[in-house]
Amino acid sequence: MISAKMVKDLREKTGAGMMDCKKALTECDGDLEKAVEVLREKGLAAAAKKSGRVAAEGIVSTYISEDMKNGSIVEFNCETDFVSVNELFVELANNLSKQAAFSNVSTAEELLEEKYIADESKLVKDVITELIAKLGENMNLRRIAKLSVDKGVIKSYIHGGGRIGVLVKLACEKEDAKLAEIAKDVAMQVAATNPLFLNRDGVDTDTLEKEKEIYRVQALNEGKPEKVVEKMVMGRINKYYKENCLVEQLWVKNGDYTITKYLQEQSKEIGADITVEAFVRYEKGEGIEKKEEDFAEEVQRQMNQGK
């Protein structure tokens, strides 16, 4: 006979529904471990069905080592904002960012094949699949990035509960406690303004030529004479640099300073040059096309699947 305690134990072990647990235990003559396997098999089958659904919600998670010399950032997606704040989902996202920081891999695909940092008996991809079965939504480790520095600091900033995450690499020959605060200021700038490039050197030729052509056509359409068009184009390109290159942007906390000027002032105080060497900015779901479905159609679809 299947007792309430047996059902409770199986629910705690698997997170499956009460009736599913009871059916599995009945099927396995009360053998708890076999029932776990049965539910996993059913859960994995359900997870496979869910894998085709769009996962555009989720969170961005970062991890910084205690010495602030290494950092990582990951985007972990799910289908709804409800699951994105689920304790188990957030815990897994945070563990994935920590694992990425200490791993030798450089892509999400490679990380999925590693042993899971919190339970080395499982691969990362299997842990994700288990959570898909448990929470009933498709999930996807979309991307990861890492930064490290010998002299300087790595700092992160998370905005909006994981909607935006930023990783910043600040280089400085002198170790100073204030570097962390400066790096956070820069990370907040990146979160707020979403710069496309670190500096002018990072702007590729194709992008630059495309912008020049757009500005050239705009100037000609405004009826400007040919001789002044090039001057106008260069003026607008300089404006483009100031808007899209991090070090040339006006600092959001004090519009009298550019980021370069702010770092120069801080360099004087510390007594050593401070430079931003790299940054990574992730915004959850950016670039993912989310299918909008009619609620009534969605309910009908689920009813049809249940037949």
Curated annotation (Swiss-Prot):
Gene3D superfamilies: 1.10.286.20, DNA helicase RuvA subunit, C-terminal domain (1.10.8.10), Elongation factor Ts, dimerisation domain (3.30.479.20)
A GO molecular function held by the record: translation elongation factor activity
InterPro entries xrefs: EF-Ts_dimer_sf, Transl_elong_EFTs/EF1B, Transl_elong_EFTs/EF1B_dimer, Transl_elong_Ts_CS, UBA-like_sf
Keyword annotations of the record: Cytoplasm, Elongation factor, Protein biosynthesis
Family annotation (Pfam families): EF_TS (PF00889)
One annotated Gene Ontology cellular component of this protein: cytoplasm
Annotated region (Involved in Mg(2+) ion dislocation from EF-Tu), positions in chain: 80-83
Presence of keyword Ribosomal protein: no
Record-linked CDD domains: UBA_EF-Ts
Subcellular location: Cytoplasm
PROSITE patterns: EF_TS_1
Domain of life: Bacteria
Entry similarity comment: Belongs to the EF-Ts family.
Role played: Associates with the EF-Tu.GDP complex and induces the exchange of GDP to GTP. It remains bound to the aminoacyl-tRNA.EF-Tu.GTP complex up to the GTP hydrolysis stage on the ribosome.
Name of protein: Elongation factor Ts
Organism: Clostridium botulinum (strain Loch Maree / Type A3)
